[in-house]
């Protein structure tokens, strides 16, 4: 789903990676920060960006690992860096890394890593806290991506795309019902995320699949599907 302002940011990240010629086999520069609210799809974005960077670096089978800051605190950093040599490490909830982990990772990044790409993903405040107390570590992250807050139209577009990818289609009244569900969740102190829309869509899909025998027969006869043989999600599937 095209997201407002993301294309420009991605172009910048790829361009910066191309221009970064002073890694000298290490991870001392050219690493990436991904900032966004909980449930905004940071990890999916991180994996896509890593793949794009690896393609640009002409790495055919670059290794990629995803780990949380908490889990990394219990691991041997040297071993992880050595296993992922030349690949990428995506650290979710990076703000949960403790001081010792940050220091060890910082040192490991200055050694021969095969130019391993490190991606930290986190919400703004915990990431700012982590980096402000570790300035040397912060300098190694020269690119950043900010996942924007989605407006309702973008969230509905995501819902439609998600439905299509899973063999479903939302009819016009169903789209209005989806807008209504999203609107009910939006509050001054809470912004609706992609993860929440995915939940709404999963519920609607589950509801349409739990139809009785009569409706299954109807669908077999061609009703309740569109020309591309996708099952139609309608208003009643969202009003549950």
What are these regions (language model features)?
Residues 162-169, 176-240:
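C-terminal alpha-helical "lid" subdomain
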Residues 71-111:
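Conserved alpha-helical scaffold flanking the Walker A/P-loop in AAA+ ATPase domains
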Residues 52-84:
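AAA+/P-loop NTPase substrate/partner-engagement loops
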Residues 132-150:
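A short helix-turn-beta junction within AAA+ P-loop NTPase domains corresponding to the substrate/partner-engaging
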Residues 97-138:
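Conserved catalytic/switch belt of AAA+ P-loop NTPases
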Residues 71-73, 95-97, 123-128, 150-155:
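Conserved nucleotide-binding/hydrolysis micro-motifs of P-loop NTPases
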Residues 1-30:
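Pre-Walker A (pre-P-loop) alpha-helix and adjacent loop at the N terminus of AAA/AAA+ ATPase modules
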Residues 29-61, 141:
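Walker A/P-loop
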């Amino acid at each position: 789903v095209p997201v407002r302002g993301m294309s420009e940011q991605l172009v910048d990240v790829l361009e910066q990676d191309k221009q970064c010629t002073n890694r000298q086999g290490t991870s001392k520069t050219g690493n990436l920060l991904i900032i966004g609210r909980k449930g905004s799809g940071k990890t999916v974005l991180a994996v896509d960006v890593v793949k794009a960077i690896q393609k640009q670096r002409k790495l055919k089978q670059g290794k990629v690992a995803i780990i949380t800051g908490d889990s990394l605190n219990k691991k041997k950093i040297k071993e992880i860096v050595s296993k992922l040599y030349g690949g990428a490490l995506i650290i979710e909830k990076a703000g949960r890394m403790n001081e010792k982990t940050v220091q060890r990772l910082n040192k490991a990044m200055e050694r021969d890593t095969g130019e391993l790409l490190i991606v930290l993903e986190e919400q703004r405040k915990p990431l700012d806290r982590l980096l402000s107390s570790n300035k040397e570590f912060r300098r190694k992250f020269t690119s950043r991506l900010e996942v924007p807050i989605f407006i309702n139209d973008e969230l509905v577009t995501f819902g439609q795309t998600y439905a299509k990818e899973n063999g479903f289609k939302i009819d016009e009244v169903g789209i209005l019902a989806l807008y209504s569900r999203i609107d009910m969740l939006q509050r001054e102190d809470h912004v609706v995320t992609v993860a929440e829309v995915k939940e709404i869509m999963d519920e609607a899909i589950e509801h349409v699949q739990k139809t009785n025998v009569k409706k299954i027969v109807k669908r077999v006869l061609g009703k309740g599907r569109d020309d591309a043989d996708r099952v139609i999600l309608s208003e009643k599937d969202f009003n549950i």
